[in-house]
């Protein structure tokens, strides 16, 4: 039986493969059904490998690459870090953030508001007239203009993961589990995920919702009372989502959902960057607000400092030759970072409050009890953000953080992979017995 990989699609694509899966030993696992709103099917797009036991990854292979695609002047397609670096050379030939458009039809009345936000927040031009589905315009240095579908761009990233995994393992990998945010719960998004898998050379075995995958990675179903509830909060690099899930007859269903496709860790980075742009102006007399190259270097340094402050009280923002011979080397404390982003952190809490209110409305009264809170995404590792979420629930709810938030969805898809292989193996043995 061909082994599969786990792919989690966020601001970056994550790929994991466990040692146990590589040995192709017999697998047992938990049936993880796709999370659904009542009466609806709900997709998600992620593919992951199977760890030896729940919560223990024992990973022999793991890869994470940014969701960037670029086109060099010689016609070469660049993916991941290479593509992001090329953006500094020719920003019109590099794109990112296209996950938000997967399966979307911006000409539909229900998606016009989203379409307007796309125009306001994404720097590249989007053509909505070609084949109904949105196509992204890229322009190389020689002036060549290309229109590329979102599925094709996404498949380029997935194919890069597939190629890297096969080179490492020494054999073909043909199957994957995909995960998508719960917001992508329509058949168009689900179909786009399967189509992306086929373009990349994968059999997309299943499409899961990220909240379901994360909850099952933590084994929430083993502790949750019947019809108990869990809040799943996802704050990634560029998107944020909060949902309330309930467990009914062993399956997760969604009681509420709040999704912001243009809010996340990049907003925190921007606040720090703006702070240091002002500092450079006042201290060195240089205005780098219109200098794209300098801003990119500063933004990268600020993001690095932000991550450091998740586990340290102090960090330094260091950029050599920022502009006109100016070397930047300035301290940034966790307290300063929290002050700069306080209102944005409260925006995350507001997301949680809205989704909890939706869940209470479902019950038509206030009997809703939240049993657990699961965190997804690298931005949820920020200590102040965790503190505010914990305080929202009166300090009585421990946040499920045993598994790293930026890996938990991938591991949840791995668990589902185990179950699929177990079912297929059981079916194969049953057929052999009958014959």
What are the language-model segments listed below?
Residues 2-116, 128, 139-151, 156, ...:
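Oxyanion-binding/catalytic loops of NTP- or PPi-dependent enzymes
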């Amino acid at each position: 039986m061909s082994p599969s990989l786990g792919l989690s699609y966020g601001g970056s694509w994550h790929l994991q493969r466990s040692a146990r899966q590589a040995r192709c030993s017999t697998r047992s696992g938990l049936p993880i059904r796709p999370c659904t709103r009542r009466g609806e099917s709900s997709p998600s797009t992620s593919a992951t490998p199977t760890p030896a036991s729940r919560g223990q990854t024992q990973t022999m292979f793991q890869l994470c690459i940014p969701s960037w695609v670029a086109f060099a002047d010689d016609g070469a397609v660049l993916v991941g870090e290479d593509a992001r670096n090329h953006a500094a050379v020719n920003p019109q030939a590099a794109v990112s953030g296209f996950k938000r458009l997967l399966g979307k039809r911006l000409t539909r009345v229900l998606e016009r508001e989203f379409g307007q936000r796309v125009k306001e927040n994404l720097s590249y031009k989007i053509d909505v007239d070609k084949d109904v589905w949105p196509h992204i315009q890229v322009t190389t240095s020689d002036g060549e203009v290309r229109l590329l579908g979102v599925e094709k761009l996404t498949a380029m990233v997935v194919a890069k993961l597939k190629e890297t995994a096969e080179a490492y393992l020494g054999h073909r990998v043909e199957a994957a589990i995909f995960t998508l945010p719960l917001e992508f719960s329509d058949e168009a998004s689900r179909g786009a995920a399967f189509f992306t898998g086929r373009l990349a050379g994968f059999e997309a075995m299943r499409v899961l919702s990220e909240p379901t995958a994360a909850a099952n990675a933590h084994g929430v179903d083993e502790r949750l009372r019947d019809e108990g509830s869990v809040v799943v909060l996802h704050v990634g690099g560029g998107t944020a989502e909060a949902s309330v899930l309930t467990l009914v007859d062993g399956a997760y269903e969604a009681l509420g959902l709040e999704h912001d496709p243009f809010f996340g860790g990049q907003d925190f980075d921007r606040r720090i960057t703006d702070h240091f742009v002002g500092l450079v102006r006042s201290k060195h007399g240089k205005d780098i607000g219109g200098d794209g190259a300098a801003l990119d270097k500063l933004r990268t340094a600020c993001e690095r400092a932000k991550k450091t402050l998740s586990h340290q009280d102090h960090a330094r923002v260091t950029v050599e030759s920022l502009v006109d011979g100016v070397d930047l080397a300035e301290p940034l404390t966790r307290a300063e970072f929290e002050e700069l982003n306080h209102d944005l952190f409260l925006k995350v809490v507001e997301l949680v409050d809205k989704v909890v209110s939706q869940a209470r409305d479902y019950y038509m009264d206030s009997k809703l009890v939240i049993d657990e809170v699961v965190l997804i995404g690298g931005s949820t590792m920020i200590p102040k953000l965790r503190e505010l979420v914990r305080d929202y629930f009166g300090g009585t709810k421990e946040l499920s953080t045993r598994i790293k938030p930026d890996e938990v969805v991938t591991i949840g898809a791995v668990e589902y992979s185990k179950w699929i292989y177990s079912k297929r193996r059981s079916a194969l043995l049953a057929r052999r017995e009958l014959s």
